[in-house]
C-alpha cells in the first residue's frame, strides 16, 4: 500500500498547503485526487513520489519509507514532460536512464526508432510524453502517479496513452493516483475519488 501518513507541506514563507493529510492507495486501486487549481495537487504528487519531503509525516510503501537511492517503487508522470527530461540528452539516453526499456513497451506506446536520435525540443508534447511513460513503466513501479498526463494532448494520443497506462496497472496490479480536471476521464478511470481541499 502507498500511504501518506499525517503529512504537512508548505513552501518557505507561505502557509502549509496541507496539514495532517493522510491517504492510502491499495494495489490495483485507481484513486482520483480532487481539488480546485492552486490547492497543491501537483505538489502532493511530488511529495508522494519522493521529489519533495514533507515537513511532518511520512510517505510509505508497505510500511517502509521511500528509498533514498535506486529506483523508486512510486513513479510520477507529469503534465509537462519537457520538465522531466534533460534537454541536452538525445531521447535514447533519456529513455535508458533508469535501465533497459523493453521493445514491446516502445511498440505499445508507438515510439518510433527515428525519435530515439532526437533531442526533446525536436518532439511534440505527445511524443515526449510517451518517452516519459516508457521510462516510468520500464522500472516496473508498484504505484503510478499521473498528474494531468494527457491534458494538452489530442484525443487520439490521450486514448492511446491511457490504454497503455491502464493495461499496465491491470497486468501488474499496480496502484494509481491520478489528477485530472476532466470529469469524464476521472469518472471513467478512477475506482475512488479523494478530496484534497
Task: Specify the residue positions occupied by each region the protein language model found.
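A short, flexible loop at the N-terminus of ABC-type nucleotide-binding domains that lies
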Residues: 1-4, 8-20
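Q-loop/switch helix immediately C-terminal to the Walker
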Residues: 80, 87-102
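Conserved ABC ATPase signature
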Residues: 119-123, 127
Amino acid at each position: 500500500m502507498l500511504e501518506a501518513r499525517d503529512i504537512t507541506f508548505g513552501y518557505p514563507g507561505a502557509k502549509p498547503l496541507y496539514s495532517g493529510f493522510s491517504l492510502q492507495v491499495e494495489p490495483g486501486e485507481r484513486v482520483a485526487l480532487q481539488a480546485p487549481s492552486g490547492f497543491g495537487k501537483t505538489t502532493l504528487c511530488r511529495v508522494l513520489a519522493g521529489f519533495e519531503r514533507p515537513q511532518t509525516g511520512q510517505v510509505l510503501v508497505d510500511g517502509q519509507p521511500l528509498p533514498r537511492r535506486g529506483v523508486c517503487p512510486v513513479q510520477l508522470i507529469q503534465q509537462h514532460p519537457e520538465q522531466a527530461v534533460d534537454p541536452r540528452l538525445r531521447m535514447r539516453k533519456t529513455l535508458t536512464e533508469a535501465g533497459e526499456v523493453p521493445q514491446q513497451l516502445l511498440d505499445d506506446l508507438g515510439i518510433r526508432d527515428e525519435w530515439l536520435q532526437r533531442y526533446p525540443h525536436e518532439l511534440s508534447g505527445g511524443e515526449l510524453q510517451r518517452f516519459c511513460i516508457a521510462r516510468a513503466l520500464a522500472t516496473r513501479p508498484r504505484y503510478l502517479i499521473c498528474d494531468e498526463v494527457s491534458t494538452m494532448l489530442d484525443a487520439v494520443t490521450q486514448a492511446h496513452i491511457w490504454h497503455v497506462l491502464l493495461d499496465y496497472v491491470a497486468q501488474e496490479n499496480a496502484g494509481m493516483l491520478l489528477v485530472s480536471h476532466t470529469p469524464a476521464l476521472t469518472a471513467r478511470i478512477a475506482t475512488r475519488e479523494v478530496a484534497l481541499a
